[in-house]
Amino acid sequence: MDPQNALYYQPRVPTAAPTSGGVPWSRVGEVAILSFVALICFYLLYLWVLRDLILVLKARQGRSTEELIFGGQAVDRSNPIPNIPAPPSQGNPGPFVPGTG
């Protein structure tokens, strides 16, 4: 190589590292973070809105919310608890006196 042409022939230096044939790790990180955020949003939506909406919809089908809380056991409505009136009061019995009655 003569010195006159040395100015035109400079050594070739790569400007960037060659890329490997695959998905870049930054893209994998973005997908993982977005999936995690979406999962948290869905969980909070369930806690604040969807759980109450499910209870309301099931209650409209004829089941009370107490029945929903205790699961799928059917309530026996054929033998309800009777309303027993309170025993009659004897009026004011007065002060307690030991040794009487």
Curated annotation (Swiss-Prot):
GO terms for cellular component: host cell membrane; membrane. InterPro entries: Gemini_mov. One of its GO terms (biological process) is transport of virus in host, cell to cell. Its main location: host cell. It is found in: Host membrane. It is a single-pass membrane protein. It holds the Pfam family Gemini_mov. Residues 75-101 are annotated as: Disordered. Belongs to the mastrevirus movement protein family. Interacts with the capsid protein (CP). Part of a MP-CP-viral DNA complex. This is Movement protein. It comes from Maize streak virus genotype A (isolate Kenya) (MSV). The lineage of its organism: Viruses, Monodnaviria, Shotokuvirae, Cressdnaviricota, Repensiviricetes.
